[in-house]
Amino acid sequence: MLIYLNSLADDILLGLYRIGKGREEEKRGEQELLVEMLCSEVELSHNEDGKPLVEGYHISISHTKGYVAIILSKKHQVGIDIEYRSERVKRISKRFLRSDEHFTETEELLTVWCVKETIYKLFSEDHLTYQDMKVDIQNKIAADVTKSRKVAFVIASTREYILTYAWL
C-alpha cells in the first residue's frame, strides 16, 4: 500500500510502501512501488554486489519491518535507508561507530546507522566501511573520510521508523 510519494528536487522521486512479512512481499512491494513512481512496469535487476538496477535511473532501495523505501533519479546518484525503531541498535553500535563518534541514545544510534547505510549505497562502487564514514547529526552532514567527501543527508522519522536519504 502506497504511503508516500514525492518529488524531492529536479528529477528525484522518493516513495514509501507498506508491505507484509517475508522476502516475497519485499519483492512484490518493490515492483508495486516502482509502478507507482514511474507509472509503468520496469525491469528491476541487481549487479554482482546486489545493487539494484533500473535502466535509465540511479536507484536505491531499503526494507525494514513492514516497509520498502525507494529513491530514484535519472541524473543524480542516490542512497536511502530505513530502519525500524528498536533497542537492538545499542547492542550492535560498536560495529558501525567510529572511536570519535560518541552517540549513546537509541535515536542517535539509529540515525547514524541509517546515514551510514545511505552513504554506503550512495558510494557503493567504493565499498566503504563504517569506519570510513563519519556522521554529524546536528548539521546533517556525512563524510567519507577516505576521500574527504562530504554529503548532506535528510532525516524523516516516525514512531515506527527512521528514514535517511541523500543524493549527489
Show which residues each predicted segment covers.
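Core catalytic alpha/beta fold that binds nucleotide/phospho-ligands
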Residues: M1-L168
